Amino acid sequence: MIDPAGIYLIDKPAGITSNGCLSIIKRKLGIKKAGHSGTLDPMATGLMVVATGRYTRLLTDIITDTKSYSGTFSIGFETNTLDIEGEVVRRVEAAVDPRLIESAAEAFLGESDQLPPKVSAIKVQGKRAYDLERSNVEFELATRRVVVSDFTISYRPELDCFGFDLACSSGTYVRSLVRDVAYSCATLGTLLQLRRTKIGSFDVEEAVAPEAVTADLKISMSRALSSFQRIFVSKVVADDLFMGRRIPAGDLTALVSPSDDRIAVFLEPEAAGASLDGHDPPLVGFVRMLDGWLKPESMFPLA
């Protein structure tokens, strides 16, 4: 039986929450613990990187700061949620040249301070902003620094809306970006559709539906940790690291570049034996190389 603990690429469908998606995955895999790479609104679809079991701790290590999206938006009206699922609260009748909207994208490249939507999961004094907003409680959200590294907008006359492709930092609210693009052109904007297409090097084309997930569909740890330098150690060394002992780096110093970054440690293939399950040797954990020693930092005892 394949151990279900691991990293999975999931294509979230529309109409369910991100936590609802996790519930399906936990049921399908028969596990109790799972986490994901960042919330997608119920109306949104696309890539979620899901970690299960003991590997939920890996999420902060494998999720890069850049996420990519595609979607559509309309102008001339705004909802209370800034997307099509909310109630229309404002309209403007003035016509706007589509070319003005298309050219506005360039002004949003780079760093900027973004005001999140009030209907969001941000906590305000211990309560979710969306709960406060729905209870008609007055509150203000702080702006947050975001980075947009790529952004293109194109008018779709057959649908009378605008399509976009976007790469941005984690924590960017696409609904707010659409709002701000519209404001910059003296109109209003509302998100119609949103699909997350990439998280770092992970692509939605590799993902599976939550209902289709099985333990053999988890990605290899070498793929999950492709941004890390890596070394392979014997079972004896792995056991010492699990005990929190520093290990002389010895010949391993020639296998990694000098750096203060953490190094991923795997069990040697011959030591892993039958536990491979067709995947890479098991992850032992992370170390730093300091003054010729391997210092354990975050370890993952073998199942």
Please report, for each region that a protein language model flagged, where it lies by residue.
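Accessory RNA 3′-end/elbow-binding domains used by RNA modification enzymes
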Residues: M1-P13, N19-H36, L40, A44-L47, ...
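RNA pseudouridine synthases
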Residues: M1-S176, D180-E205, F286
